[in-house]
Amino acid sequence: MSGRGKQGGKARAKAKSRSSRAGLQFPVGRVHRLLRKGNYAERVGAGAPVYLAAVLEYLTAEILELAGNAARDNKKTRIIPRHLQLAIRNDEELNKLLGKVTIAQGGVLPNIQAVLLPKKTDSHKAKSK
C-alpha cells in the first residue's frame, strides 16, 4: 500500500464562521472584505472586523429597541421610518451621533413653543365676577 487516500486521517472539522465564533449576528467576513476593499489602510488586522461588526450590531440593536418601543407606544406592530426618527431624536446620545442624518419619511418631533400656547387664565375668578 502506498498510503494514499483518507483511510486513517482525521476528519476535517466543520467550518465555523467568524461571526459565530465571536457570538455575533453581523457578518465578520463581509466587514473584513469591505475594510480591505475600501482603501482605508494597506493592511487590516484580524480583530478589527470583529470589533467593528460588534459595534455595528450593538448600535443596530439599540436603535431597533427604541424604535420598537416607539411603535408600541403608537399601538403599531411594524416599525416604520417615523418610529426610527422618534427613537433617535428622543435619545440624547443617538441624536448627537446621527445629528446630521436625514431619515426619509421620518417627519419631525412634535414641538410647540411655550410662547405660542394659549395663556392660562384663572377660570374660577372669571366665573365668580
Curated annotation (Swiss-Prot):
Sequence positions bearing N6-(2-hydroxyisobutyryl)lysine: 6, 10, 37, 75-76, 96, 119
Any one of the GO CC terms: nucleosome
Biased composition range(s): Basic residues: 7-19
Modified residues (N5-methylglutamine): 105
Keyword Signal among record annotations: no
In-chain residues carrying the UniProt-annotated modification N6-lactoyllysine: 10
Modified residues (N6-succinyllysine): 10, 96
Keyword Phosphoprotein belongs to the record: yes
Keywords: Acetylation, Chromosome, DNA-binding, Hydroxylation, Isopeptide bond, Methylation, Nucleosome core, Nucleus, Phosphoprotein, Ubl conjugation
Modified residues (N6-glutaryllysine): 96, 100, 119-120
Residue span of region Disordered: 1-22
GO MF: DNA binding; protein heterodimerization activity; structural constituent of chromatin
UniProt modified residues of type N-acetylserine: 2
PTMs per UniProt: Monoubiquitination of Lys-120 (H2AK119Ub) gives a specific tag for epigenetic transcriptional repression. Following DNA double-strand breaks (DSBs), it is ubiquitinated through 'Lys-63' linkage of ubiquitin moieties, leading to the recruitment of repair proteins to sites of DNA damage. H2AK119Ub and ionizing radiation-induced 'Lys-63'-linked ubiquitination are distinct events. Phosphorylation on Ser-2 is enhanced during mitosis. Phosphorylation on Ser-2 directly represses transcription.
PANTHER family: HISTONE H2A
Protein's recorded name: Histone H2A
Source organism of this protein record: Cairina moschata (Muscovy duck)
